[in-house]
Amino acid sequence: MFVTFEGIEGAGKSTAIDYLSDYLQARGHDPVLTREPGGSALGRRLRALLLDVRTGGLASRAELFLFLADRAQHVTEVIRPALEAGQVVLCDRFTDSTLAYQGYGRGLDTEYLRSLNTAATGGLEPDLTLLLDLPVRCGLERAGERNRSAGMVIAEGRFDSESLDFHERVRRGYRALAEEEPERFAIIDASQPPEDVVLQCRSAIEAYLRRRGRGLD
């Protein structure tokens, strides 16, 4: 099972993934936790470039192809082998981030982006996508506090420094994507306390499995 986690900055995706990993391990699974950018050795180098605020003047298409290079390597090196081995993969961001950020946020054509995503992934799509949704100002406040606490304001703050309008477009983009594919997406109210967010995510995964006559145990 391939589960992706999407949302604006500060939505709490990493926290939810960590809790769900513990939940799955308690039920005998060995989940693979990964992220974009940065899920492979190459990806970690690309992440440092893409998220650093000192990476100035990066053209939208240049940014796009760096993310796609990360994804192509990530799928080949990490995601597809894990799925073929029967493991559950929990991924912090995937193809929908490209549509939301480079499409709705940067204004690149979404159909063009879909075709590039397909090329980068070899057609691999998530089984379930959990969209952690919350107001933009709340998310940015959380992201800023997180990066300050970790000393990562410079190293990982490039997207946090985008305009409020940019992040509003990204959020609207995510919600539009969820409306287009309601069977794949579950919208999670990420403005709630972390424990409530995790419960929503867990319920969404269990509901997905019930629809397919499967269980976690």
UniProtKB/Swiss-Prot annotation:
PROSITE patterns: THYMIDYLATE_KINASE (PS01331). Gene3D superfamilies: P-loop containing nucleotide triphosphate hydrolases (3.40.50.300). It catalyses: dTMP + ATP = dTDP + ADP. One of its GO terms (biological process) is dUDP biosynthetic process. It holds the Pfam family Thymidylate_kin. HAMAP family: Thymidylate_kinase (MF_00165). This is Thymidylate kinase.
